[in-house]
Amino acid sequence: MSLSRILRYNQRNNKTTASLTAEHAYSDNWAYSVSLGDPTSVGVNMAAKTGEALNKSYDSVFSSLPVADSVPRTDFTASSRDDENTDVQKLTTSWMEKIDTKMPENISKIDSNIISSPMVSKVEARFIVPKGRLRKNSTDFTSSFSNSLSLPKSYGKLIFFTSKKNSSSTKKNLANDISDNKHNNNSSNTIGHNIPVTTATATCDEIACTSTEHEYNVYEEERMFTTRVYSLEDSVSSLSTNPLDDTYSEAVQVNTRHIEDTESTAHIRKHSYTTSLSSIKRLFKITSFSNNNSNSCDHQESTVADDCAISSSLKETTSSPVSTGSFSLMIENEDSDRDQIIQALYSNIEASTDLVSRKYRDLDVVLGEGSGGKVKLVQRVLDNKVFALKEYRSKKKRESERKYIKNIISEYCIASTLKNPNICETLEILYEKGKIFQILEYCEYDLFSLVMSEKMHYEEICCLFKQLINGVKYLHDIGLSHRDLKLDNCVVTRRGILKLIDFGASSVFHYPLSSQMIEANGIVGSDPYLSPEVFYFNEYDPRALDVWSVGIIFFCMITRRFPWKYPKVKDVQFKAFCSGRGVSSFKDLVTRPATDDSNNYDNDGYEEGVIDMGPNFILHRLPEETHKIMRRILEVSPFRRITINGILQDGWIKEIETCQVVGAASPNEASLRIINKGNHIHTNIDQRYAHIGGLHQRT
């Protein structure tokens, strides 16, 4: 869902700086650079050539990094820079001048959102991270999540699903299962995530009541305890109960099972609950739906209306093996039950809505297009209100239909549950003529187009940046991480309210009633926004990835360019950023533990007058008041990186005046009021170019 852009080089201080402006983006003169929208799927891989030409001695994470004295200052003469006998390569961007910069002819079809992440087998050799050195103390992770069970009632439905008919037997079976597991060493601990393995689950009808406060019971052998689940409409508590603990070193249960030989183990990953948002689907159990279930739907709120329609649909349209069976049991015999599963899933989608063409009128406007599908502008026939319609891509040839449907429904289940002013509302999911559609709240602009317009003022950028932080905080507070934060996945209303979209790559790092931190794995998202640990760690804390991506987005908003193509030492720009840190290798840098001394963060790699390396390689392009917090956000070591709550404690962040939505938590516009701050106005641009789809058409 991104755009191919036109880039040019500007000579400044004897080094090449890549810039992106609307003038160049819409001209016919194309040049290649490491800049916003810089495509990586082109024929000539610039970063690969750079790694071969200038980084032959830095191909491994164990490679040494240049120190401050070995990196040239900006006052070096041209002759000294071109001296072939110099022992140390000059870490500037002048190397670009020597490499072919010709762009391919099919530039209009290149999409920066489809930045091909390297295959796991192609990633540099990973290394074992010593568990003991990565944490300041052995603080129990439970304390970090003591107040994090603030979840909406509909979120409970996604995880605890069974029929009301079997609720009494469920409680008995659950008590027996817990009793057995209590004396079994190979019970829930064998999974590694402290999630009980039981065929019985809590009754969803008991959870999804109309009150803002709900209770559900968990039975043990001799006693019962009650846990309260509060709606997200109430205040959401932070994951970190201590504001001083602003790094991820305290909360992360570091998993040291990293691979050293990627060639032999790249495709032999152990199954876990950390893969993606779609793993929640494993907890879904479709049991028999009786008349009691149908009646109970009438007492549930609109947030779970679709689930009621789904249950009714299964009862009326599916055969008994599907309506009385379980998806988890069908996995063992997927071939024989495949048709029934697909029929049930399709019936679920069709049951909640009418056909697309009956409810919505296509306005023939493409808002964006990417690897996951396309987004179009539609108008509801009932009231002429405008919405965004996401049309999912067709099933790939080698992709099972069951997996294809499951991933889409899993994304919808989570997205439709999120209720926050800085989250784009997901309304419904539809099925028509073999295609799946999702109806979303329409926002007038996307952040990428606003940045491309070059009309944004600094105060407006700061306002949107703080709203982005608030949106990410909301996700982290309920146990979700986005994992694909970028300009393309941020949309803005005409009143200046930023909203996050696209939760297909999201990861659940904390389940209700669990004290375990669930790490994520895999390389997802767009390379320029990824954090370095994603490439080098087998498993990582997804919250730290989100924080890093937030910093990259702010840098792009200020400079209208990417700092690097991807965060690997093969990239000259990133290697310069990692240099001068007082460590001998990149491995030591990315695994540095957290420290109690805040001065170690503020002065780390900071040296006056040196802008060719270290944090100043990035900071000298940003306003001075942002340097302190940006050093913490773009900390190479995830264990030293600041948390999203720590960002909000920064003095500069606190002083930012941000536009906000006040009123009821419901997305109903009639009950909401937007307060715009008087120190800035929000940019308005031509609607023809307000979205990436329009920019595509212009080029």
From Swiss-Prot:
Domain Protein kinase positions: 361-653
Pfam families xrefs: Pkinase
InterPro entries the record matches: Kinase-like_dom_sf, Prot_kinase_dom, Protein_kinase_ATP_BS, Ser/Thr_kinase_AS
Enzyme class, UniProt record, top EC level: transferase
Expression induction or repression: By the macrolide rapamycin in a TOR-dependent manner.
Chain's role: Protein kinase that functions as a regulator in the pheromone-induced mating pathway downstream of mitogen-activated protein kinase (MAPK) FUS3. Diminishes transcriptional induction of genes in response to pheromone signaling.
UniProt family annotation: Belongs to the protein kinase superfamily. Ser/Thr protein kinase family.
The name this protein goes by in its record: Serine/threonine-protein kinase PRR2
Gene name, Swiss-Prot/TrEMBL: PRR2
